[in-house]
């Protein structure tokens, strides 16, 4: 297990800027608005050949607002999980009451963990002199850095990695990556929390309370699963601040990163245009897709309610009807593990390899069932087929003239191939080549 380093402190002291520098990414949203990072998220980092995990947190505060209270609870949970704590303060705003309060809390409750007092935004000697006041916290010698410029970060990291326990050999990460996607407030974080059995994500009725992508792990039937819970995709016209826009970009990137996308929709709202855009985006990126109709416990049901609901969805998504639809409730935990099992099966379908001999037996069968016709009356000969895709199913059909293959015959071949080899939940690509 990689050591976990938690970045903690009051809002807007530069935690996300340091997180981005350590993880060499823009995974965390940075902004001058206090509380921009409202949840925990984790990324891989490496220094001097030593790998570790770094965790960003929302911020330590005493605000009575329910959302800030939840953010505070998440910060305390992050400290409890961490192996090393970087307690960050802001030299430009000076020593604050919250800094003193948090230092007392750390000294009282986490004596067994290495805690580093990190004075951030120190870009000049004068600021370093002013930073001496943070010695009043009674913690270790302060480390003066500029997360933005990189000053002092190398020396800090040398000390941090030296505090790690002896390194152990780690196995290659073979976890299947599942992106939990959907519009705001459809229950994505509640779904993840119900699976993990812990309040890993802030859950609130306020749309958009998860603005970043968050990674969590679980095991299912001996298989490692990485859950990527993303910010909801809003209609572009509703994104009126840079923060929300950047979060929607993060969702795009989460889809890019995953093996299978789990699209959650609200049972009472149904499938909307933005959901269809998300599905199309995932399909274009050749990802596995599963639609999860959440809050099914709120729907009054008759004998054929679920079938009628599924039929409406399939009418809306048209030629993407190979996507499975499941009905779940994050609140009552109905079908949650069935959803994960379906996602795992979809992931296996995405990696499925069919031998050339099997494919050509299939081809001869379908050609005998329905020989291809052409508009011009010219003869079309499909000679053989083979699988060529490395990361998702791609099949090359070799024929005398690819231009003669009609679109309806292409649909027929795809339908029969899916029926024969089961590619449920997975986009399948066909290439027609001249031979």
From Swiss-Prot:
Domain KH-like: 352-435
Keywords, comma-separated and alphabetical: GTP-binding, Nucleotide-binding, Repeat, Ribosome biogenesis
CDD domains, A to Z: EngA1 (cd01894), EngA2 (cd01895)
Location of the EngA-type G domain: 3-168, 176-351
Molecular function via GO: GTP binding; ribosome binding
SUPFAM superfamilies the record matches: P-loop containing nucleoside triphosphate hydrolases (SSF52540)
InterPro entries named among the record's database cross-references: G_ENGA (IPR031166), GTP-bd (IPR006073), GTPase_Der (IPR016484), KH_dom-like (IPR032859), KH_dom-like_a/b (IPR015946), P-loop_NTPase (IPR027417), Small_GTP-bd (IPR005225)
Binding-site positions, GTP 2: 182-189, 229-233, 294-297
Binding positions (GTP 1): 9-16, 56-60, 120-123
One GO term of the biological process aspect: ribosome biogenesis
Gene3D superfamilies from the UniProt entry: 3.30.300.20, P-loop containing nucleotide triphosphate hydrolases
HAMAP family associated with the record: GTPase_Der
Family: Belongs to the TRAFAC class TrmE-Era-EngA-EngB-Septin-like GTPase superfamily. EngA (Der) GTPase family.
Assembly and binders: Associates with the 50S ribosomal subunit.
UniProt function note: GTPase that plays an essential role in the late steps of ribosome biogenesis.
Protein name: GTPase Der
Gene this chain is encoded by: der
């Amino acid at each position: 297990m990689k050591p976990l380093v938690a970045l903690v402190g009051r809002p807007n002291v530069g935690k996300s800027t340091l997180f981005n520098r350590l993880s060499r990414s823009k995974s965390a949203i940075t902004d001058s608005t206090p509380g921009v990072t409202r949840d925990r998220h984790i990324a891989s980092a490496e220094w001097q050949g030593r790998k570790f995990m770094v965790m960003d947190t929302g911020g330590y505060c005493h605000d009575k607002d329910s959302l800030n209270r939840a953010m505070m609870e998440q910060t305390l949970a992050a400290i409890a999980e961490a192996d090393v704590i970087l307690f960050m303060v802001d030299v430009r705003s000076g020593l604050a009451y919250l800094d003193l309060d948090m230092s007392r809390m750390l000294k009282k409750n986490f004596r067994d963990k290495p805690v580093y007092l990190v004075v951030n935004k120190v870009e000049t000697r004068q600021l370093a002199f002013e930073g001496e006041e943070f010695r009043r916290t009674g913690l270790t010698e302060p480390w003066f850095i500029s997360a933005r410029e990189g000053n002092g970060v190398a020396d800090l990291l040398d000390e941090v990695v030296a505090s790690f326990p002896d390194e152990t050999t780690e196995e290659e990460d073979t976890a299947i990556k599942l992106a939990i996607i959907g519009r705001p407030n459809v229950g994505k974080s509640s779904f993840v929390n119900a699976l993990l059995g812990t309040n890993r994500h802030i859950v609130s009725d306020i749309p958009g309370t998860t603005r970043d992508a968050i990674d969590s792990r679980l095991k299912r039937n001996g298989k490692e699963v990485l859950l990527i819970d993303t910010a909801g995709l809003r209609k572009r016209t509703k994104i009126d601040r840079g923060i929300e826009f950047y979060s929607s970009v993060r969702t795009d990137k989460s889809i890019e990163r995953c093996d299978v996308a789990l699209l959650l929709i609200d049972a009472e709202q149904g499938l909307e245009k933005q959901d269809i855009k998300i599905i199309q985006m995932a399909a274009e990126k050749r990802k596995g897709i599963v639609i999860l109709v959440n809050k099914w416990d709120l729907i009054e049901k008759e004998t054929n309610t679920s079938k009628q609901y599924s039929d409406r969805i399939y009418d809306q998504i048209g030629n993407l009807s190979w996507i499975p639809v499941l009905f779940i409730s994050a609140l009552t935990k109905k079908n949650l593990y069935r959803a994960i099992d379906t996602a795992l099966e979809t992931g296996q379908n995405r990696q499925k390899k069919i031998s050339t001999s099997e494919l050509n037996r299939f081809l001869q069968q379908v050609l005998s069932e329905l020989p291809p016709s052409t508009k011009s009356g010219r003869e079309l000969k499909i000679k053989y087929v083979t699988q060529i895709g490395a990361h998702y199913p791609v099949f090359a059909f070799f024929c005398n003239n690819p231009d003669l293959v009609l679109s309806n015959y292409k649909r027929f071949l795809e339908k029969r191939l899916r029926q024969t080899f089961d590619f449920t939940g997975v986009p399948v690509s066909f290439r027609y080549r001249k031979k």
